[in-house]
Amino acid sequence: MKIFGSKNKSEAESATLDSQGQEPEQEKGKGFFKRLKERLAKTKSSITGRLDRLILGKKEITGDLLDELEEILFTSDLGVETTQVLIDIVQDKVARKALKDPAKLKSTLKEQILDFLTVPPADRRTPAPGEPLVVMVVGVNGVGKTTTIGKAAALFKSKGNRVMLVAADTFRAAAIEQLEIWSKRVGAEFIKQKPGADPSAVVYDALEAALSREIDVVLIDTAGRLHTKKNLMDELGKVNRVAGKKLPGAPHETWLVLDATTGQNAISQAQMFNEALGITDIILTKLDGTAKGGIVVGICHQLKLPVRYIGIGEKIEDLRPFDAEEFVQAIFD
């Protein structure tokens, strides 16, 4: 049963709900959670491993203990702002005698971090009945953008959607080739032009083809590096505008792909792209290879942007819908 491309309002409404990336219940469970905990082991060690050692044998919450806690949170890549807010919350609870036992610090932080991660969906436009959901995927080179698009296409395909991949990163021939390989692997339609072509023209032609072929989901790969930051943002802005002219409301969603291993740089990238394009969703890749997974907390808290997917490995099924409760449980329990 298809999710997108519905011909009546009620079906289109349910399509929007289903587009949030939730997978069938049978695909969730103990096996995935165990793998999630394994892949987040470095992040867990960075945060709760050091926290456990800090509070071991402590009888009270002192100023020195809070200073050490602040260092643990900051060096776990939660960011200056998020770390300070967490410390302020703990200090307030201590001052009010609501928190006395160092052993309760962990549960306090767990509860507050879960609150930070629970970000409501950003405003997003809904495709009209019979029109495809158009997703523009952005991010700097090297974050795993093209691979993420291929894996996301597989998720959409698994739910019966007709998917089209669009090679609008025309500045790198390798990106076009890589996306074409992914399209064949997952069974998606593919639109490209020659290297160096106008990315906006590629997107315009792709949306025309998507309408005629009754495509349900269009995923657009974009450039990640031009001569200057301004050139890149101008180019992406043009792609955005052309998509909207061809299909009013498009792109309906704009996903930003970030590399978790870059730590605090990911927050500055998110701010830059969000100011220029209005990001609806964050996708965080390479969480399995880093102790900097705390960056998820900083991004959600500072930018109030929801995390849509996380990448925890190289396999096609390792791009998973983000679940804040599972993430916090994997780190703290």
Give the positions of each predicted feature:
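P-loop/Walker A NTP-binding module and the surrounding RecA-like catalytic core of P-loop NTPases
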Residues: E81, E111-D333
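Non-catalytic terminal/linker segments enriched in charged/polar, low-complexity residues
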Residues: M1-D123, G130-M136, S158
